[in-house]
């Protein structure tokens, strides 16, 4: 992934006393992903079911990884025909296996009968809720602890577990 930043500057004679006279816009190009392994995913939020998901790494020399569409894959492997969106779980992992993910709201469950009130999203706010939103990596068994947002309410914490048993780059020898 490449990024480019452009700055737009408003001439001083056209600005007001409030607001910004400069706006920066960053444009990102998607990464090239290559499959490096698989992980056994267990959904501790909605179903308790398990599935095998692909693990991919960005080829552009980063420590950027993703678990590919865990909920969609789980539904498909368990014979469901109504599938949620295919949201990937993207994260960085350093050479010691420490994992970080951008804070944010990630829609993971929509279009199925599990959520009657609409869409459900992972509400990952590790700065605001450090005891409830975090990653734990025990030699490739990765647990995501997160809150769940349905409408305007938060629930949890809940966990997703990924046993990265095929292709984990930092396995103990």
Q: What does each of the following model-derived ranges do?
A:
Residues 10-14, 148:
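Surface-exposed loop/turn motifs at beta-strand-loop junctions within extracellular Ig-like
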């Amino acid at each position: 992934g490449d990024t480019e930043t452009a700055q737009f500057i408003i001439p001083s004679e056209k600005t007001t006393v409030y607001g910004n006279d400069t706006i920066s816009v960053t444009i990102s190009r998607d990464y090239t992903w290559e499959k490096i392994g698989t992980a056994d995913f267990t959904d501790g939020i909605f179903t308790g079911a398990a599935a095998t998901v692909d693990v991919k790494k960005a080829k552009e020399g980063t420590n950027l990884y993703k678990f590919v569409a865990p909920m969609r894959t789980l539904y498909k492997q368990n014979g469901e025909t109504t599938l949620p969106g295919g949201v990937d779980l993207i994260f960085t992992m350093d050479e010691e296996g420490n994992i970080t993910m951008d804070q944010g709201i990630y829609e993971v469950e929509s279009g199925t009968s599990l959520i009657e009130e609409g869409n459900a999203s992972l509400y990952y706010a590790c700065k605001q809720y450090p005891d409830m939103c975090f990653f734990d990596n025990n030699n490739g068994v990765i647990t995501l602890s997160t809150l769940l947002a349905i409408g305007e309410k938060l629930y949890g914490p809940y966990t997703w577990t990924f046993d990265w048993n095929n292709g984990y780059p930092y396995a103990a020898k």
